[in-house]
């Protein structure tokens, strides 16, 4: 009986050692081995031909913005981050003498040099007329993505696409684009025969196609505006009425969100909306983790203030 008790105590001590050792091991040893991939989304909107920073004149925006500081930050992030997409939500043109003189050529060239992956069109991108925008696309090394403008029989025919799928490591990222209704906002002669179609219907149809093509994440570049006090279609309405869009990169209303807004879509899942002001004063950064089951987690959201303020 004494021997059995001694053996019991000895075996109990061994078991206790195993339990203690197990508690000291990293938790991830017992975690699922499900693969997690990461993607970083950098984005701008409503840059409005602001190639240089605001003048150092003591005003509120003095020294802010400019492509030099944006390009430097983008280069730094790409050097530190493996998978990056750089996107713009429209209104590239109009707002400084650069557009008045050169009609958008330096803006498009600058975006190409910075390595933008895609953009959509804003209403001010029609300000030089459709033929002008078409001519400037000669300098673009990135696609213009729009799914709710029918540009058949216009100078832009064949020069926009409804979506594009980007392969980033193990991930397939689908990007679509929607634009605002032009009638009453843009002079008729500047958008010509462009036919505006319901952006919610077009976005849902395009997103479903991207989902069926196996995209792990679906992003909408939108120039609808974040929200309105009437029933005008906005990013907020699109987020609530969509089925498969994970992220809406917005523009038009020049809002600087302190953090992405979260909405529940038609499938009961999260759709995020973000926007980063105007004039290229900010660069948005969103870092996502995506599991093999296509579950998205926003790890980090930040808007970088670009340029240096003149302090007097």
PLM feature segments, named:
Residues 3-308:
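Acidic, metal/ion-coordinating pockets
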Residues 312:
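Hard-cation-handling environments
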């Amino acid at each position: 009986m004494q021997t059995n008790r001694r053996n019991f105590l000895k075996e109990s001590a061994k078991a206790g050692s195993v339990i203690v050792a197990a508690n000291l091991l990293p938790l991830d040893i017992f975690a699922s081995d499900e693969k997690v991939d990461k993607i970083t989304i950098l984005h701008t909107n409503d840059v409005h031909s602001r190639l240089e920073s605001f003048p150092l004149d003591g005003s509120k925006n003095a020294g802010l913005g400019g492509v030099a500081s944006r390009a430097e930050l983008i280069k730094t992030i790409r050097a530190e981050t493996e998978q990056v997409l750089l996107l713009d939500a429209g209104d590239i043109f109009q707002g400084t003498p650069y557009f008045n003189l050169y009609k958008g050529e330096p803006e498009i060239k600058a975006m190409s040099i910075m390595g933008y992956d895609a953009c959509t069109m804003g209403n001010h991108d029609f300000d030089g007329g459709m033929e002008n925008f078409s001519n400037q696309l000669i300098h673009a090394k990135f696609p213009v993505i729009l799914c709710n403008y029918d540009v058949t029989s216009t100078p832009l025919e064949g020069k926009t696409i409804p979506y594009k799928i980007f392969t980033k490591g193990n991930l397939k990222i689908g990007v679509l684009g929607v634009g605002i209704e032009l009638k009453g906002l843009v002079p008729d002669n500047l958008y010509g025969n462009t036919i505006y179609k319901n952006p919610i219907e077009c976005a849902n149809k395009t997103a479903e196609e991207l989902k069926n093509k196996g995209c792990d994440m679906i992003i909408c570049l939108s120039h609808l505006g974040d929200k309105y006090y009437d029933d005008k279609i906005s990013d907020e309405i699109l987020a609530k009425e969509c089925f498969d869009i994970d992220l809406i990169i917005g523009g038009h209303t020049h809002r600087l969100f302190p953090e992405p807004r979260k909405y529940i879509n038609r499938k009961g899942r999260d759709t995020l909306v973000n926007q980063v002001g105007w004039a290229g004063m900010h660069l948005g950064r969103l870092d996502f983790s995506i599991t093999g089951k296509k579950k998205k987690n926003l790890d980090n959201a930040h808007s970088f203030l670009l340029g240096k303020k003149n302090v007097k």
